[in-house]
Amino acid sequence: MAAAAVATPGATVLPPSVPSAAPGAKAPAAGAGKGPGNLLEITGEANIVNYMKNRLRKGAMKRKGLEMVNGHRFGVRFFKNPTYCGHCKDFIWGFGKQGFQCEECRFNIHQKCCKFVVFKCPGKDTDFDADCAKVKHGWISTTYTTPTFCDECGLLLHGVAHQGVKCENCNLNVHHACQETVPPMCGADISEVRGKLLLYVELKGNNLKVDIKEAANLIPMDTNGFSDPYIAVQMHPDRSGRTKKKTKTIQKNLNPVFNETFTFELQPQDRDKRLLIEVWDWDRTSRNDFMGSFSFSLEELQKEPVDGWYKFLSQVEGEHYNIPCVDAFNDIARLRDEVRHDRRPNEKRRMDNKDMPHNMSKRDMIRAADFNFVKVIGKGSFGKVLLAERRGTDELYAVKVLRKDVIIQTDDMELPMNEKKILALSGRPPFLVSMHSCFQTMDRLFFVMEYCKGGDLMYHMQQYGRFKESVAIFYAVEVAIALFFLHERDIIYRDLKLDNILLDGEGHVKLVDFGLSKEGVTERQTTRTFCGTPNYMAPEIVSYDPYSIAADWWSFGVLLFEFMAGQAPFEGDDETTVFRNIKDKKAVFPKHFSVEAMDIITSFLTKKPNNRLGAGRYARQEITTHPFFRNVDWDKAEACEMEPPIKPMIKHRKDISNFDDAFTKEKTDLTPTDKLFMMNLDQNDFIGFSFMNPEFITII
């Protein structure tokens, strides 16, 4: 976040005499004029150019203090009343902010238990057919005669009579207000009270092999909040201790990694015994403490090997059975898919050549080996953008590389698929970046796009400080035409900002990065996903309200203000302050803004989306006929016939001087991925990604 603060009443605004700064020129310090403002107060030798140069790039959807787990948005919370963890059922103790609470479903939990929540947030929309994965609770209003705590939020069920509801099937007790946010997973064990262990067990003949890999979410046994765990493996019962084997002790750790292997030569008398796995806490001065256990019969091990996570149980329970860790939602959804697959026995899935685009032959398929990666020219949360030269040609491309493991772990499979679909649209205006092709390897997705030599507008704003109104109009017109195209096809962009507006070699606009875009959103059809870049997000997004394509026009108004003022209309030291200002403050304009500029920006920055310019059915007509664009020939603009005010300086074919040094100094090496994770990755999730754009090939 840029080092900016919202000025208090009485802060100075830019005087009307300040001209637009030329590259390298110094703008006079603010302070020559006085008046109320919501702008950054610039004093001393500071100026707009230096402010823009020091401004940091902001990524989309970066929220501090939040943990995203299975759709839950866990924020740090101070609990005033006695509260129990909804995962491990222990008391949430401590001073200050003791635990986490989901902002969607109010699920309370220890910070240490947060990452072990296996069910999806009931308050968040899911993409799959949720009705097929529901096992609903049977709630009955109940009067409790003893103190009882809510199994959802962890607070006391208060009152004299009918304090809460109880599930007649699984005995879950919750508040009346909490029953709507309880996940529909009646009967499913979704907690790991004692932790879990990852292991592999295989029985071949009389040889039993046990691989102890790692444990997680173990219970703290020492006063320092940690444990000193080790794993004990033996055949049970075994009073002599003949078969007992132990791993090394991992000190002060609740998530130890062991990676040890044990082998057993089974005797005939062992055939009726069970393989017992226990976790113990080692103590130097006293007796070791039991932490958890589970066991397997040799009969079940003979049928098939055991490979995966298993929950630790109590000492009595662990001697008799085991419980595998499963994602209940995904497990039911998997069974649903298997049933649907069985209903269509004659429908054969296309599994061969799944990396090959559907509209080209195998001989012409694009591969990563076809390119020489020259420089890094961009970077995001999922991957990076590389300048690439196609081998054997003079063709230069911008190749966006995304890691599959990051996409899967963040449950964002729809993002690259949406981006590919939008980049492949036909009849697109010249102000949307063109895609040459997209392909995949075992661990990455690749978008091959046209190379925009001029860099992004963030870089150019850092050089100029701010633009004259005529320059701002030029860029606003070309960006608006790109948005018209998307909105007329029911696509909301959701990430309009300086970083995502590139210039080609002539200086015309190219809108890039459609990862957050979504189809099926109109002026009436809404969506609720909280996403975007903080300074550009509309009030309805910040408030978690349903929003439509009108949210894009709010971002457009912020962008227009930024063009001419050299800063965003709503600043703050952190996201919380920025969001509060977006919802409550009004934009205050520098004195050099024209009446038409203030009018159109005010119309775009209307808090109520239904009253916002661009929100109605006639958005194109209302925007193009506004007095701010009175001198614009929109037909010439759409034909790319307007003269760009800034022509990028390009010294040679591979010149990257128009890109941020923070990117170009990085190595082009691709970050290694987790090989074990990639081996278990279902590549079927990416079938249909690869594509060759016939329109781009025609241009070449």
Swiss-Prot record:
Binds 3 Ca(2+) ions per C2 domain. Tetrapeptide ligand at C-terminus is tethered to inaD by interaction with the second PDZ domain. ATP binds at I377, G378, K379, G380, S381, F382, G383, K384, V385, K400. The active site is at D495 (proton acceptor). It holds the Pfam family Pkinase_C. This is a calcium-activated, phospholipid-dependent, serine- and threonine-specific enzyme. This isozyme is a negative regulator of the visual transduction cascade and has been shown to be required for photoreceptor cell inactivation and light adaptation. Negative regulation is dependent on interaction with scaffolding protein inaD. GO terms for molecular function: ATP binding; calcium,diacylglycerol-dependent serine/threonine kinase activity; protein serine kinase activity; protein serine/threonine kinase activity; zinc ion binding. This is Protein kinase C, eye isozyme. Keywords: ATP-binding, Calcium, Kinase, Metal-binding, Nucleotide-binding, Phosphoprotein, Repeat, Sensory transduction, Serine/threonine-protein kinase, Transferase, Vision, Zinc, Zinc-finger. A zinc finger (Phorbol-ester/DAG-type) spans 71-121, 136-186. Ca(2+) 3 binds at D283, S286, D289. One of its GO terms (biological process) is response to ethanol. Its cofactor is Ca(2+). Its EC number is 2.7.11.13. It comes from the Eukaryota. Ca(2+) 1 binds at D222, D228, D281, D283. It catalyses: L-seryl-[protein] + ATP = O-phospho-L-seryl-[protein] + ADP + H(+); L-threonyl-[protein] + ATP = O-phospho-L-threonyl-[protein] + ADP + H(+).
